[in-house]
From Swiss-Prot:
Post-translational changes noted in the entry: Palmitoylated. Probably palmitoylated by ZDHHC3 and ZDHHC7.
Pro residues: bias regions: 35-46, 122-131
Keyword tags: GTPase activation, Lipoprotein, Palmitate, Phosphoprotein
Protein name from the UniProt record: Rho GTPase-activating protein SYDE1
Biased composition (Low complexity): 47-71
Gene name as annotated: SYDE1
Species name: Homo sapiens (Human)
GO CC annotation terms, alphabetical: synaptic membrane
Length: 735
């Protein structure tokens, strides 16, 4: 950078010294100086002797001590003077000589403008090559440089103070040199010097983003001297301020357009500008706010904590969201609650995406927030995609009668329900948390596709699907996606009436009455619901293992088997919202299904075995018939010295009728010191000695007979009790 400046400086000094000589020489010779055609060995143009002497003058010591140059050096500042004198020697060696071989740069005048806006002359384009017919005083610029056209002789002679203007420019050289040294390496400056453009502004990479706007350029591309800097386009533009609130279109979702049927695919760019109208309560402190963005109920983006202002909160947040079948965009304003140490929603707004981007790709909206506030945002949809072509449903989402008609399964129950229920009852009744846990989503997607292809070919063996939760999840997904729920509106009303008429905790319903509740359903729905209720009743019977009581099963299957909204409810207050109605419906769903499961019989349990109670109850014995021999035997009570048997033994019952099957332990299970066999007494021996007749017959060899002589004490007490019972019947005995 310093070399061209030195060449320019000394060329101007040299031009001032050559001007009188050229005039005198021209008058003497009468013809202008001519220069021969340049040649590679001798690039310096030939001139007369007087001109050559003048050209070599500045390089000699005498020329350096000329009074004009001394005056010029005295006018410079000390730092500029030292810089000019220190760089003069290498400049003389490289630039001020008669010519540099191999470069093709002859010695001549070099014009250079360090400050472009101060030079009123526009830059001229560099000629492609040297022109042989040019004058000697004009000179040739170095290759790759873009000098301005030199001034004419008339302008040079008429200039009142060329030395003064040059000195002013030379004062700026140190600062310009320092700035250019910070721009980059020398190689970068060489590339800029070799650029074909003649504009110093593009060479110095100046930026116009910091300058004020100047007047427009003229037709010739020139600008006024004080028009400011130009820009090369690499510098960033000054960011524009936020748009005014009047440029945003007010937007509010009506109550009848909560669920649009269409969907949207693409990339959504959302820029938040601010929140307005959030007026805190009187005396409340500023709150920490944040904004949460949801797409179809799923949280997708969130801002950091923001300090809420009195009325308006300025935002500058941009989010890029991928949309897949998106319908609703919801913005929630969350406020920090120090009591529970968490954020709570204080306002929310909803945007219907398909209707917003209908016919346009960008919208600036002022979204109305509930209960108060406005959200200023710009929504831009890019890379919009068409809705993917969905295949016709074959199992999931197909009406139940149509699926049964296509598959023709046994029992009018779809194959997917039959196969899933069979596998669950075979290997899942004792699994803890059945129907509560969720299986792998990838495996469920694979099984779902298999059912869509061919339900009859699906095998749910334990080797292929060892996780029973995958099968339970597929069953619940199928029931959830039915167009019409299994428990329809008429059945729902019938069950509610039955619950009000016969509560299960007061009067247990009968089997016929519970099954009769399903008579209002069509055949296919009734068969399918009957199979499911039988299955759920069987699962609840194993609640000791799987912890799935009827109440837990009702919680899992209530929202699946019943519709989302059963009956129109009364209009509620605006503050309650749809959440309260959904909670009430969910509670009713659980109660209805719980009632059905409690009162539903389980036909797959084994039927009750024959009643075993008669074996334990005392039988009504027929009257005792005693076989009488020829000598008539008279039965009379025998006197006892002791008291009668205690009352506890009077109703001990007849143990002799129980038989061997009821007492498998044999005859000796009551053997012990108090139940030894009683032998005959002395009185009996005396009677035998006297010769009284002895009762003989079939009872003598029968060990089970009541008069067996091998009776124990307990049997004897039972026999006495029987005799006393028979005597109390007023039987006439012949004496």
């Amino acid at each position: 950078m310093a070399e061209p400046l030195l060449r320019k400086t000394f060329s101007r000094l040299r031009g001032r010294e050559k001007l009188p000589r050229k005039k005198s020489d021209a008058k003497e010779r009468g013809h202008p100086a001519q220069r021969p055609e340049p040649s590679p060995p001798e690039p310096e143009p030939q001139a007369p002797e007087g001109s050559q002497a003048g050209a070599e003058g500045p390089s000699s010591p005498e020329a350096s001590r000329s009074p004009a140059r001394g005056a010029y050096l005295q006018s410079l500042e000390p730092s500029s003077r030292r810089w000019v004198l220190g760089g003069a020697k290498p400049a003389e060696d490289t630039s001020l000589g008669p010519g540099v071989p191999g470069t093709g740069e002859p010695a001549g005048e070099i014009w250079y403008n360090p400050i472009p806006e101060e030079d009123p002359r526009p830059p001229a384009p560099e000629p492609p090559g040297p022109q042989p017919g040019s004058a000697e005083s004009e000179g040739l610029a170095p290759q790759g440089a873009a000098p301005a056209s030199p001034p004419t002789k008339a302008s040079r002679t008429k200039s009142p103070g060329p030395a003064r203007r040059l000195s002013i420019k030379m004062k700026k050289l140190p600062e310009l040199r320092r700035r250019l040294s910070l721009r980059g390496p020398r190689a970068g400056r060489e590339r800029e010097r070799a650029a074909p453009a003649g504009s110093v502004i593009s060479r110095y990479h100046l930026d116009s983003s910091v300058g004020g706007p100047g007047p427009a350029a003229g037709p010739g591309g020139t600008r006024s001297p004080r028009a400011g800097y130009l820009s090369d386009g690499d510098s960033p533009e000054r960011p524009a301020g936020p748009p005014s609130p009047t440029s945003f279109r007010p937007y509010e979702v009506g109550p009848a357009a909560r669920a649009p049927p269409a969907a949207l695919w693409g990339r959504l760019s959302l820029h938040l500008y601010g929140l307005g109208g959030l007026r805190p309560a009187p005396g409340a402190t500023p709150r920490d706010l944040c904004c949460l963005l949801q797409v179809d109920g799923e949280a997708r983006a969130r801002t950091g904590p923001l300090r809420g202002g009195p009325d308006f909160l300025r935002l500058d947040h941009t989010f890029h969201l991928e949309l897949e079948a998106a319908r609703l965009l919801r913005a929630l304003v969350l406020a920090w609650d120090p009591g529970v140490r968490r954020h709570r929603p204080c306002a929310q707004g909803t945007v219907l995406l398909p209707t917003v981007f209908r016919g346009c790709q960008a919208q600036q909206l002022a979204v109305r927030l509930e209960p108060q506030g406005l959200l200023y945002a710009k929504l831009t949809l890019s890379e919009q995609q068409e809705a993917p072509a969905t295949a016709e449903p074959r199992v999931f989402g197909l009406p139940l009668p149509l699926l049964v008609e296509r598959e023709r399964p046994p029992g009018q129950v779809p194959l997917i329900i039959q196969k899933c229920v069979g596998q669950i009852e075979r290997r899942g009744l004792r699994v803890v948390g059945l129907y509560r846990l969720c299986g792998s989503a990838a495996v469920k997607k694979e099984l779902r596709d298999a059912f869509e292809r061919d339900s009859a070919a699906v095998c749910l063996s334990e080797d292929l699907y060892p996780d029973i939760n995958v099968i339970t999840g597929i069953l619940k997904d199928y029931l959830r996606e039915l167009p019409t729920p299994l428990i329809t509106q008429p059945l729902y009303k019938v069950v509610l009436e039955a619950m009000a008429r016969d509560p299960p905790n007061r009067v247990p319903p009968t089997t016929e009455g519970t099954r009769g509740l399903l008579s209002c359903l069509p055949d296919v729905e009734r068969a399918t619901l009957t199979l499911l209720l039988d299955h759920l009743r069987l699962v609840s019977s194993f609640h000791a293992y799987n912890r799935m009581t009827p109440q837990n099963l009702a919680v899992c299957f209530g929202p699946v088997l019943l519709p989302a909204r059963q009956a129109p409810t009364r209009p509620r207050a605006r503050s309650s919202g749809p959440g309260l109605a959904s909670a009430v419906d969910f509670k009713h769903h659980i109660e209805v299904l719980h009632y059905l499961l409690q009162s539903w019989p389980d036909p797959r349990l084994p039927r009750q075995s024959p009643d075993v109670a008669p074996y334990l109850r005392p039988k009504r014995q027929p009257p005792l018939h005693l076989p009488l021999a020829d000598p008539e035997v008279v039965t009379r009570p025998r006197g006892r010295g002791g008291p009668e048997s205690p009352p506890s033994n009077r109703y001990a019952g007849d143990w002799s009728v129980c038989g061997r099957d009821f007492l498998p332990c044999g005859r000796d299970f009551l053997s012990g010191p108090d139940y030894d066999h009683v032998t005959g007494s002395d009185s009996e021996d005396e009677d035998e000695e006297v010769g009284e007749p002895r009762v003989t017959g079939d009872f003598e060899d029968d060990f089970d007979a009541p008069f067996n002589p091998h009776l124990n004490l307990k049997d004897f007490d039972a026999l006495i009790l029987d005799l006393e019972r028979e005597l109390s019947k007023q039987i006439n005995v012949c004496l």
